[in-house]
Regions:
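Non-catalytic, charged helical/coil tracts that couple and regulate nucleotide-powered enzyme cores
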Residues: 10-25, 212, 217-242, 286-290, ...
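Cross-kingdom leucine-rich repeat
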Residues: 253-256, 261-262, 284-285, 518-528, ...
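Regulatory and partner-binding modules of innate immune sensors/adaptors
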Residues: 68-170, 176-182, 207-210, 290-291, ...
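A conserved switch/coupling segment of P-loop NTPase cores
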Residues: 183-190, 242-317, 396
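Extended, amphipathic alpha-helical segments that serve as helical scaffolds
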Residues: 1-62
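A short hydrophobic beta-strand->loop->alpha-helix junction that borders the nucleotide-binding pocket
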Residues: 194-203
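N-terminal flanking helix/linker immediately upstream of nucleotide/cofactor-binding cores
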Residues: 97-172, 176-185, 189, 200, ...
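Surface-exposed helical/coil interface segments that assemble multiprotein signaling complexes
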Residues: 47, 51-63, 79, 86, ...
């Protein structure tokens, strides 16, 4: 009864809120009714959480008094009775308030507002999810602008660094246009370095420079043979001390010198910030470009003495192009039935007025609706937005920008109304993220799970269900897909600035989340979720008052500055005993306070703070913890009690992993990254026997002494999909252990114990049927080992780096690597590389890194018709061999659209 009360009240709120949204926005009676009902629901939630908190505290006190069970038991029973009595009294008071609210509804004649039929039609699993990844950024109507932009970026007549501006009203398609050109083969081939920076609200020049510097380093690191592989442990960004102030400006200038670069800046920029950016980018007359996507204010800021092309201004879509974008979003390769086509397409054009964002959001609603009844109801809902087409209104639907903004707002409101309730919460949560900036999908889903937004579904993990939620939001065009992995998972998403502003307004009105862009936070004591997204010079958080009702805090501060400031101790959270989510990035933090152990409701603890070096012993008291995500430069210790928390799902932290005897029942654990084994020496059975549901495992500091325990562990991990092993001695049996049949991604960093190939290697194609991605560093394998890799049936991405191969002659066998699409070789000792006939028939990208001794390219490259990109990193002799004219290897790669050379 007690646990069902908050759920029933939240259902009551959903009904009340739906009625409010169906009425006029100025209906104060309904607004008061919804607000009071929500307050009652919050009170019920507080009462239940307080009961659980006090009961948990009493339980810990009882366990800390050994040897006095008989004397302690009567008092404990009396205490529990008192707790339950207190909770029952609070629930009775809440029920009385609810009755008063219901009476007021009758008094003021707040009647039920019928819900339209279309609001119940949500076929997420069938229509929307099936097409979530078929939503490419269509550039219908932008062909002329694309050609203009390419011409300006690739213009050999202007060798000086030049600015290419794109401007226009919000949601007109500026970013879509720029990204299409940015990703084109011609641009990728022309520029050695390409960076893209989206400017969040109140961003500073140092943030822009730091982001450009980081992207440039990442591009060079992906090509170079470094001591750290490109896919470093989660939280690697937090481990890096990025320069600040003048240091980052000087380092960026130095690193960019000698390179032709394209720097894209997406957002409004001030004069001061533009001057800082311009001074940090060298102008060497090599045709470098700065592509600026901005508004009129941003254009005024960039006026300078250097070359600047005439701005490109995308127009609204014409009626014909509006039809085409809408058709593709709703019907894919099909089309609207002929008898409805003219009618609905005219409606869509009048409602959206040719604005691409409005078109795709409306399409996201209608793609799951039945035609014609539900379509008619949706169109009727937007009927007030219709106005006669005005002549001279531009390429699109005419009307002023304010009218278009109002129409776009109405469409977003309707799309939000159409979301199922659980997706409403997931969408509003995006108000706590930065706008127009990539958001890690795995982190977002883990936060949703911790908040309780994700509903369990038989046969699927909570994370898989959460990924489904995210895909549905993408399909509905409420969220933008930035990147997806090779295994079908969403990797990064973003939210358009207008959609983000809408989400923040809705979240604020519903008391869902309180967002601040300053570290000096003035928030009401009743706030339940707090987001601090600051780009100021401060790396602390100052609260004006205690927040006893706080459930979640998301803090994203700028990194890499003010290293001399006083460290935080999270004292501002001591009064927030109901916290469920702590997600903090950039805070100056060395250790967690002992008081963290009393916050027993915490489910997600994420601290991306590079100086973090100590965890308190009380962290083992967090009996509801699901995710521990730590990014730091220091290895940390945790008590054995931590490893016995049964709710653990994701541990990404530099921790020591004890022997299996000290591990509890970790049946929920799916992710274990960054840990190093301790107590695994000399066998001792299977150390991960109680974590058999692991999907992703990353271990470091492995030695030969760990071999027995590691192999025993791998034999029990039937569900493992990703494996990353690093150390002095790695077992080659990872290719032959039958239990790892689901393994898709494998990274090995260190010498393998059987360089010729493990026993049973002849069956590798059957034992590793799903292995898609393989990266090997310093493994020192022999030719026979490579021959084994060649028969893997689904290997699509292969990297052999930094002494991964032991020898100066490497051969890819005939008809081997049938599914390989991406190859990366960084073998400094390699002199001769031969490729057999019909080998790598689908190869699309080849990267050669510092293979300075390689005498020539394989002749077989000339016949690889799918090859789209060749990258040569620090290989000047090979660059000469592929030059047109006298290059002896030019004929082997002359058919490749993109050939990129990078020097270090």
């Amino acid at each position: 009864m007690i646990t069902h009360q908050p759920e029933w009240l939240h259902t009551f709120i959903r009904d009340a809120d739906r009625r409010r949204r169906r009425r006029r926005r100025d209906d104060e009676f309904v607004a008061v009714w919804v607000r009071q009902t929500r307050d009652v629901a919050f009170e019920a939630e507080d009462a239940l959480d307080d009961f659980l908190h006090r009961a948990g505290r009493r339980g810990r006190a009882a366990r800390s008094r050994p040897g006095c069970a008989l004397g302690w038991w009567p008092g404990r029973c009396a205490g529990e009775v008192a707790l339950r009595h207190d909770l029952s009294g609070r629930i009775r008071q809440i029920s009385k308030r609810l009755e008063q609210i219901s009476d007021n509804r009758a008094t003021f004649n707040i009647e039920r507002t019928p819900t339209p039929a279309w609001a119940f039609s949500c076929c997420s699993s069938a229509t929307t999810l099936a097409a979530w990844d078929d939503l490419e950024e269509y550039t219908v109507g932008l062909d002329k602008d694309i050609d203009k932009l390419k011409e300006k970026l690739l213009d050999d007549a202007v060798t000086a660094r030049a600015v290419v501006p794109i401007s226009g009203e919000s949601s007109i398609g500026k970013t879509t246009l720029a990204r299409k050109v940015y990703q084109s083969l011609e641009v990728r081939s022309h520029f050695e370095i390409r960076t893209w920076t989206a400017l969040p609200h109140k961003c500073r020049a140092a943030d822009v420079l730091r982001d450009i510097h980081r992207q440039m380093n990442n591009q060079l690191r992906r090509a170079a043979s470094r001591q750290v592989p490109e896919d470093a442990c989660d939280g690697a960004a937090a481990n890096t001390r990025w320069p600040s102030g003048k240091d980052v400006s000087n380092q960026l200038y130095k690193s960019m010198t000698g390179r032709r670069y394209l720097v894209v800046v997406d957002g409004s920029i001030t004069v001061t910030d533009w001057n800082s950016l311009r001074a940090s980018l060298p102008d060497e007359g090599n045709g470098s470009r700065v592509l600026l996507i901005t508004d009129s204010a941003g254009l005024e800021a960039v006026g300078h003495d250097g070359p600047m092309y005439k701005q490109i201004e995308p127009a609204r879509l014409s009626q014909e192009h509006t039809y085409e974008v809408f058709r593709r979003r709703v019907f894919g390769r099909g089309d609207c039935p002929g008898r409805y086509r003219s009618r609905y397409y005219q409606d869509v054009f009048r409602i959206t007025r040719g604005l691409p964002l409005s078109i795709v959001v409306l399409a996201g609603v209608l793609r799951s609706k039945e035609m014609p009844a539900e379509w008619d109801e949706v169109m009727a809902q937007l009927a007030p937005a219709r106005e006669p087409h005005k002549k001279g209104g531009g390429g699109g639907g005419g009307g002023g920008s304010s009218s278009s903004s109002s129409n776009g707002r109405r469409i977003m409101s309707l799309a939000f109304d159409d979301l199922p309730h659980h997706l409403k919460s997931c969408f509003l949560y995006l108000a706590a993220m930065r706008e127009s900036t990539p958001v890690d999908a795995a982190r977002l889903v883990r936060l949703w799970v911790a908040e309780g937004f994700v509903r369990p579904r038989r046969g699927s993990t909570m994370e898989e269900v959460g990924q489904g939620y995210l895909k549905e939001l993408i399909s509905r065009c409420m969220v933008q897909l930035v990147d997806k992995g090779e295994f079908g998972a969403v990797m990064y998403v973003a939210v358009h600035d207008r959609v983000h502003a809408f989400a923040q307004d809705e979240a604020q009105e519903a008391s869902f989340v309180d967002s601040h862009d300053s570290t000096d936070v003035v928030a009401p004591a009743t706030v339940r979720r707090l987001a601090v997204l600051s780009s100021t010079t401060d790396r602390y958080v100052q609260l004006s008052n205690a927040l006893p009702k706080l459930r979640s805090i998301i803090c994203d501060l700028a990194e890499g500055r003010n290293r001399g400031v006083q460290y935080s101790d999270l004292g501002f959270l001591h009064a927030s005993k109901f916290l469920r989510v702590i997600d903090i990035k950039g805070l100056e933090l060395k250790k967690l306070p002992n008081e963290i152990g009393s916050m027993i409701h915490i489910r997600y603890l994420g601290l991306q703070c590079g100086d973090l070096e100590k965890l308190p012993s009380t962290i083992g008291n967090l009996v509801n913890l699901q995710s521990l995500i730590l990014g730091g430069r220091h290895a940390m210790e945790v008590t054995a009690a931590f490893w016995r928390i049964p709710t653990l799902r994701h541990v990404v932290a530099p921790l020591a992993l004890p022997s299996g005897a000290l591990l509890g029942d970790l049946h929920s654990l799916q992710t274990l990254h960054g840990v190093h084994p301790r107590g695994w020496h000399g066998g001792g059975g299977n150390p991960l026997a109680r974590a058999a549901n692991l999907r992703s495992l990353e271990l470091s500091e492995l030695t030969a002494d760990h071999a027995g325990a590691l192999e025993a562990a791998l034999e029990s991990l039937d569900l493992l999909v990703h494996l990353d092993l690093r150390g002095d001695s790695l077992p080659a049996s990872v290719f032959t252990v039958p239990s790892l049949r689901r393994l898709q991604s494998l990274m090995l960093w260190g010498a393998v114990d059987a360089p010729e190939g493990p026993g049973g290697a002849e069956d590798a194609q059957y034992i590793r049927p799903n292995l898609t991605r393989l990266s090997m560093w310093n493994t020192m394998v022999k030719q026979s080992f490579v021959d084994m890799l060649a028969v893997l049936p689904n290997l699509a991405d292969l990297a052999l780096m930094a002494d991964a191969y032991d020898g100066d002659r490497l051969a890819f066998r005939e008809a081997g690597f049938r599914k390989l699409q991406k190859l990366k070789l960084g073998l400094q000792k390699l002199e001769e590389w031969t490729v057999g006939a019909k080998s790598m028939p689908g190869l699309a990208t080849m990267m050669l890194c510092r293979c300075a001794r390689m005498r020539m390219l394989p002749e077989a490259l000339a016949g690889m018709k799918e090859l789209e990109e060749v990258v040569l990193y620090s290989m000047p002799d090979m660059v000469g061999r592929i030059e047109e004219g006298e290059g002896q290897d030019h004929h082997k790669v002359k058919h490749v659209p993109v050939i990129q050379t990078i020097y270090c």
